[in-house]
From Swiss-Prot:
Annotated SUPFAM superfamilies: 5'-nucleotidase (syn. UDP-sugar hydrolase), C-terminal domain, Metallo-dependent phosphatases
Entry's family note: Belongs to the 5'-nucleotidase family.
Thermal response of activity: Optimum temperature is 40 degrees Celsius. Active from 20 to 47 degrees Celsius.
Organism (species): Glossina morsitans morsitans
Gene Ontology molecular function: 5'-nucleotidase activity; apyrase activity; integrin binding; magnesium ion binding; manganese ion binding; nucleotide binding; toxin activity
Disruption-associated phenotype: RNAi-mediated knockdown results in reduced feeding capacities: smaller blood meals and longer times to complete blood feeding. Decreased ATPase and ADPase activities in saliva. Reduced ability of saliva to inhibit ADP-induced thrombocyte aggregation. Reduced ability of saliva to disaggregate ADP-triggered platelets.
Binding site for a divalent metal cation 2: 38, 91, 123, 225, 249
Keyword set, alphabetical order: Glycoprotein, Hemostasis impairing toxin, Hydrolase, Metal-binding, Nucleotide-binding, Platelet aggregation inhibiting toxin, Secreted, Signal, Toxin, Zinc
pH dependence statement: Optimum pH is 8.0.
Major site of localization recorded for this protein: secreted
Protein name: 5'-nucleotidase-related protein
Residues bound to AMP: 358, 402, 421, 505, 511
Length: 555
């Protein structure tokens, strides 16, 4: 009998501790936050590096595992009477052929199988401009989309779909959620007439406004796409109002202890900032590419102060089941993608790695810019005239090239991964002084991230002395003429005007190249960059491009 009573007692204790009834909220209110960021179209499984999973490799991640995990946590917490919130911190677009072909359509369809409660836009959501974003916003109608530091008054269709903040009305508490995207997003993508401002200032203003709208709100979460370093600044500047920051953009690994994956953590999960006001601000991020699902339960007191917390990111390895609804919904998309991408468009006899393109001349960049030149005329024109083209100079920023090419056949999917942004290849007149300024700007990054703007080129020969001060590093610069015979060079004349070719993103001032936006004249659109690349591959394969002295670096 004593054994039976003891067993019943333990059972009752188990029920009480695993079924958090509403009275628990009289002392502490638990809230579970599930979060993802920088998904980058990893609908399918990947290898541990986030690349397509090949035979023999360990396959992890994929949307089916992510959404299985989200659904499972929600159900488990409901049984305990713990409320939950599913947050997406942006950059769902771009990164695989699934997005290149399916764009907003596949992204919204599959995300809506278990839509986030709240989402902020990342910079890559703007990769195809306002026209590429609006259908996504219209289809994500079950998700609150928040961006407080964006002024959309000049883009009214966007303004209809995005708020600075939202108030999530749960059973036991109302929770304010404010969104911010990296302030420099116009330099990273095509944002149309949208304007952006400082993240912290926008958060403080939104916090005041949401409390006016609902004075009962004393828990505020920021969902950000600004990077971990900026998140820490936000915690410092807004910590009197903000309790939790759910971040993205920097693909940061936060984990307490040894993580289950191969990544090395940058800091604990969560990162804790003790604000002078007495608030404890928790900062979290869940790596990228569907490798992890963030899982944090926070316990708040009656005043909305963080008392304690528990949880860790969940690794999406093979132990995690895959959601059947997601797998079924992916089947027609996979068939379409396979049909479009398995066509052979060229061949390279050498590997063409992308990694070095951010700091030195690379063969991949030579191939890419040569294809841009070919879109406006080739050297074969010298057979019938005294000039071979109207635009003998081309350049592209390293950040435009998103994948390496490997020795062997080049599939359409390979070209698509290399050149996914569908910018126009444009020619325009540019003063020599501004051409030189663009090259100086490309060789003056302030940090590793800014190396994406390093220019690869065709029709230019430049020598940089990197020991000299920024914006004064060019020691020699020659430009190709359009006069036959092909490939003649002369010294740059800063007072002369040159006809150059670049992606439309650069010509529009993207990545900070404001001189191209402000001084370009007689702009001529030719074709999409991917089409220019494929046409060149078909014409000249097999290829064996190499570094050939277009860029010389002196240290």
């Amino acid at each position: 009998m004593k054994s039976l009573i003891g067993t019943l007692g333990l059972y009752c204790l188990f029920i009480l501790t695993n079924n958090v009834v509403s009275s628990y909220g009289d002392d502490l209110y638990p809230l579970t936050i599930m979060h993802t960021n920088d998904f980058h179209a990893r609908f399918e499984e990947t290898n541990v590096k986030g690349n397509p999973c090949k035979s023999g490799e360990k396959c992890i991640g994929g949307l089916a595992r992510v959404l299985h995990t989200i659904k499972k946590i929600i159900k488990e917490q409901e049984k305990k009477n713990i409320e939950s919130l599913y947050i997406n911190a942006g950059d769902n677009f771009q990164g695989t052929i699934w997005y290149n072909i399916g764009r907003w359509n596949v992204t919204s369809e599959l995300m809506n199988i278990q839509p986030p409660d709240v989402m902020v836009l990342g910079n890559h959501e703007f990769d195809h401009g306002i026209d590429g974003l609006l259908p996504f916003l219209n289809n994500m109608d079950k998700t609150e989309i928040v961006v407080a530091n964006m002024d959309a008054r000049d883009e009214p269709q966007v303004a209809k779909k995005i708020k600075p903040f939202t108030i999530i009305k749960k059973k036991y508490r109302n929770i304010g959620v404010i969104g911010v995207v990296v302030e420099e997003v116009p330099d990273l993508a095509n944002t149309g007439k949208l304007k952006f401002r400082n993240e912290s200032e926008a958060i403080l203003e939104a916090a005041r406004n949401l409390k006016k709208e609902d004075p009962s709100v004393n828990i505020i979460i920021v969902v950000s796409h600004v990077g971990f370093d900026v998140d820490k600044i936000i915690a410092e500047r807004t910590g009197s109002e903000v309790d939790i920051i759910v971040g993205g953009h920097s693909h940061t690994v936060l984990y307490t202890g040894t993580p289950p994956g191969p990544e090395k953590p940058e800091d604990n999960y969560p990162y804790v900032y003790n604000h002078p006001s007495g608030n404890k601000v928790l900062v979290v991020q869940a790596v990228c590419h569907a490798k992890y699902v963030g899982n944090l339960t926070v316990f708040f007191d009656k005043k909305g102060k963080v008392v304690t917390y528990e949880g860790a990111p969940i690794y999406m390895d093979t132990k995690v089941e895959q959601d059947k609804d997601v797998l079924e919904a992916m089947k027609p998309w996979r068939k379409l993608i396979d049909e479009k991408t398995k066509l052979v468009v060229g061949r390279t006899n050498v590997d063409l790695p992308r990694d070095i393109c951010r700091s030195e001349e690379c063969a991949l960049g030579n191939l890419y810019t040569d294809s841009m030149i070919y879109a406006f005329g080739g050297k074969e024109n010298c057979k019938s005239g005294s000039t071979w083209t109207t635009a003998p100079i081309a350049f592209v920023h390293a950040g435009a090239m998103r994948s390496s090419l490997h020795q062997g056949d080049i599939l359409y999917s390979d070209a698509l991964l290399l050149s996914p942004f569908t910018n126009m290849v444009v020619a325009y007149d540019l003063p020599g002084a501004q051409l030189k300024a663009a090259l100086e700007f490309s060789a003056a990054p302030k940090n590793e991230d800014e190396k994406r703007r390093f220019l690869q080129m065709s029709g230019l020969k430049v020598t940089y002395n990197m020991s000299r001060a920024a914006n004064n590093r060019i020691v020699d610069l020659k430009v190709r003429t359009n006069v036959c015979p092909y490939d003649q060079y002369e010294n740059l004349d800063e007072k002369k005007t040159y006809r150059v070719v670049s992606p439309s993103f650069l010509q529009g001032g993207g990545d900070g190249f404001k001189m191209l936006r402000d001084y370009a004249k007689n702009i001529q659109n030719q074709k999409i960059d991917l089409d220019a690349l494929v046409d060149y591959l078909k014409k000249f394969s097999p290829l064996a491009p190499k570094a050939e002295g277009r860029i010389t670096i002196i240290h």
